[in-house]
Regions:
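GHKL (Bergerat-fold) ATPase N-terminal catalytic module, capturing the glycine-rich phosphate-binding loop
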Residues: 1-172, 177-178
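Generic signature of intrinsically disordered, low-complexity segments enriched in small/polar residues
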Residues: 7, 18, 28, 64, ...
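A short, contiguous, amphipathic alpha-helix enriched in charged residues
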Residues: 34-43, 84-103, 188, 221-233, ...
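Generic recognition of flexible, low-complexity loop/linker segments
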Residues: 56, 120-121, 190-192, 239-241
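Short intrinsically disordered coil segments
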Residues: 74, 147-150, 181-188, 267-271
Length: 285
């Protein structure tokens, strides 16, 4: 094109870029992208449990196509991130901000996490017409509200010192996403998988009509293997071990049955790595 000039070079605001090209951040604009939004926020709460804080996560379906995710972990620290901007606001509204950087140097607030790029929650915020985040700790509840990634308000309430955790609520924006109705079945499947990967962590799903369902695993991957093999037609007793050294942990469950096909599932920091050829090859050897 002969008319390609300097004025053709544009610069988009961070949240404007996410809204214009959501696929780069959440994978797609369809049901899979919406499910990924839920996974991003759920993973933040799971990371609290993996770092020794909290033992329950509540997922509630709300009216007007909303969903909330609440944990009883440590809560995001109170304080001022920059003049006029709280730490809570920054975690969901300031690019490249978070508490999971530098895990390997000891300067992070987390020893392990499913993500550490400071993007997930902000991407969900950007594609939401309404986004609310709350942190509860040290006798104080902070609440921030956004719309389409833009900060709307901040307020504080005094609470009991024993209450801790993080709460996030979002309503997907139909102007950005092609699908804004949550797939309850898909979310339950995702939560069930997480319950096997995080033994000892209880998940409670509350539907809009008030009915609830709990997901909890005491034996982790051992329970998962039995779930995947409901007939329990094992040729020999399954092998299971869970070992830790320093900040590293390895959990393995292996069982053989009389079927002709195999099921292999591999995870790293709760992220499904089954499609990795290198992992699969080393596993089979």
């Amino acid at each position: 094109m002969n008319n390609y000039q300097a004025n053709n070079i544009k610069s988009l605001d961070y949240f404007e870029h996410i809204r214009k090209y959501p696929g780069m951040y959440i994978g797609s604009k369809d049901a899979k992208g919406l499910l990924h939004c839920c996974k991003e926020l759920l993973s933040n709460s799971i990371d609290e449990f993996l770092n020794g804080a909290g033992n329950q996560i509540n997922i509630r379906f709300l009216s007007n196509n909303g969903i909330s995710i609440e944990d009883n972990g440590r809560g995001i620290p109170h304080g001022e991130h920059s003049p006029g901007c709280s730490t809570l606001q920054a975690c969901y509204g300031v690019p490249n901000t978070g508490g999971k950087f530098d895990n390997d140097t000891g300067e992070s607030g987390y020893n392990t996490s499913g993500g550490e790029h400071g993007t997930g929650g902000k991407a969900v915020n950007a594609v939401s017409k309404k986004f609310i985040a709350k942190t509860r700790r040290d006798g104080l509840e902070e609440i921030v509200e956004f719309s389409c990634g833009k900060f709307i308000s901040h307020k504080e309430n005094k609470i009991d010192n024993s209450i801790t955790g993080t709460y996030v609520e979002f309503y997907p924006d139909e102007e950005v996403l092609e699908e804004t109705n949550f797939d309850v079945k898909a979310i339950k499947t995702m939560v069930r998988e997480f319950s096997f990967l995080c033994k000892g962590l209880k998940f409670v799903i509350i539907e809009e009509n008030g009915t609830s369902e709990e997901y909890y695993s005491k034996n982790g991957l051992s329970d998962y293997m039995e779930y995947l093999n409901p007939k329990k037609d094992f040729i020999a007793p399954p092998v299971y071990f869970d070992v830790s050294e320093g900040k590293y942990q390895l959990e393995v469950a292996i069982g053989y049955n009389n079927s002709y096909s195999s099921t292999v599932k591999l995870y790293t920091n709760n992220i499904n790595a089954t499609s990795s050829i290198m992992y699969k090859t080393s596993k089979r050897k």
